[in-house]
Amino acid sequence: MLADKGDSLQGKRCMIIGGGKIARAVAEKLIEYGAIPITFSDASGHVYEPAGFSEGKLKVINQIKNERGALLGRYIISSATAEFNTPEHMLDIPCDLCFPCGAMNDIDDVAVNALADKGCQGIVEGGHNCVTPGGRKVLKKRGLLYGPHTCTLTGNAIVHALGEAANDEELKQNVHRIYNDVKDTAREFNARGDLFAGSNIAGFLRVANVMMMHGAV
C-alpha cells in the first residue's frame, strides 16, 4: 500500500495494539523493514517506548509474555525510558501507522478519528475484524490507508498450503500476487483503493468460478 504511494515503512512509528504472538511477530517484521514499533498492550494496559522497541527490547517483551500469566507492566522494570498507562490512553500517542493485533472490534469510529487526529496514516489489521464497520466508514471518509484482515492474514494460509516447502521469497511473491489481484478487483468493480471490498469480491468470484466448473451453478 505504501509502495503504491511512493512511500515505505522506513522510519514509520507504528502503534501495535496487542501483546500476543501475532503482535510480537508484527513488531519483528516492522523492525526488519526499518519501521519503529512504539507500543504493546494487554489487559493490564500498554507500554510505550518513545524511541521505539529495538530487537533487544523486543526480546525482553518476548521473555515476559512467554511466562504464564505475566503482564506487560513488568517491562518498565527493565527500561528507564518506557511509559506504562491504562488502555484507554493508548490512542493519545501519535503514530504513523496502527497495527491492531488483539480482539475483534477493537477499533471503532471513535478510535479511528482519534488516531487520525494524531496523524495516523493508516490501519493494518493483524487480527480478525479488529476494525468495526463504523470504523471502516471513518477510514474511508478521512482517507486513511486500510489493510483488512482479509488481505493481511493470507500469508498464514499460504504457509499452511505450501507446508515445509515454504520460503520467504515464495511467500512474498504470493502475497504480492494476492494484493495485486485484490487491488485490481476493487478497481474493476468501481471500488478503487478499497481492499476490504476488493478482497470480499475476489473471494466470492473465486468460489463462484469453482462452483461453475463443477456444474453447481
Cite the ranges covered by each PLM segment.
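Adenosine-phosphate binding glycine-rich loop
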Residues: 2, 116-217
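Glycine-rich phosphate/diphosphate-binding loop of Rossmann-like nucleotide-binding domains
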Residues: 2-92
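General beta-strand structural signal in soluble alpha/beta enzymes
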Residues: 16, 39-42, 84, 99-100, ...
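Short glycine/threonine-rich loop-to-helix capping motif typified by GTGT followed
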Residues: 21-30, 112-113, 136-137, 207
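Short glycine/serine/threonine-rich phosphate/pyrophosphate-binding segments
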Residues: 22-26, 106-110, 131-133, 154-156
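Conserved functional loop/turn residues at catalytic and ligand-binding sites
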Residues: 34, 102, 119
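A general structural motif
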Residues: 79-82, 99-107, 127-130
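Rossmann-fold NAD(P) dinucleotide-binding segment
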Residues: 85-95, 105-122
